[in-house]
């Protein structure tokens, strides 16, 4: 029979070996559907991390109503990167590459920076863990696809505005 002190010691060792995990989510607009998605992403990450016995939730970083094409205006993203470089957590999980960055160079740059500090990124829907050997190649390919999707979306949004402008004689 294990006495109280031995059990407490075992529990402390378990806590010490848990990985601190941060999650990152982002939605690009403030509309109601996106807001619901934003809330559901946060709830999903919280539950996902809680279900993994080796993980401990550090924090959910979330940018709302901000495009993923540029990291400068994404306060929570930048705060997450700073916390990672500070050694506050070990791993970031995010839904997919396009939520993390819609620019190939940013994706590669930030995942390399994080890796230098021992922090991996798991892109769940893309099945990429940046601590895996072939991750950077797959990340580059998938990031390029996300960047192209962003460009096409931007064109679709701008096209009706441009057509209306031309038709109005301006």
Where are these regions (language model features)?
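Short, structured surface patches at the beginning of a domain
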Residues: 1-164
